[in-house]
Amino acid sequence: PIFSVSPADRAIVVTTPHVSAIHDARRCISLLDSAHLDDISVIVNAYDKHMVRRHQMISDNDITALLSTRIIGTIPYDKSVIICQNRGIPVREAKSRLGPVFARISGQIIHSSDDMRGAAV
């Protein structure tokens, strides 16, 4: 599995703020580190800030500390995603607050890729 990332210059690990998922993300990041991949970042999916405030979910700051990796995006929990999946409708077509979130994260990924290409020239 490590050989499959050898041509990559970056990796984005997507996880959820659940203990088992953070454990799996840490193992994945460790494998990517052993493949000498330097640019590793994380996207946190299904994040519920209300649960974080009630200490029922791991915070994004704790995730950053546990994974020793920067978070480039946090996607809030939104039940409309489940409804869209069950109906076969793209999330971007639903009346959801996630459209701008996905646009911001994808823009950040694209711009950081452009910055990396510019630095290599």
Label for each model-derived stretch:
Residues D24, R97, V101:
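Charged catalytic carboxylate motif
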Residues R117-V121:
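Short, charged juxtamembrane terminal tails flanking transmembrane helices
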Residues V101-M116:
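C-terminal alpha-helix
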Residues P1-T74, I83:
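Conserved catalytic-core segment of NTP-binding enzymes
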Residues Q85-L98:
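C-terminal boundary of histidine-terminating zinc-finger modules
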Residues C84-Q85, I105:
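Conserved N-terminal glycine/acidic-rich loop preference
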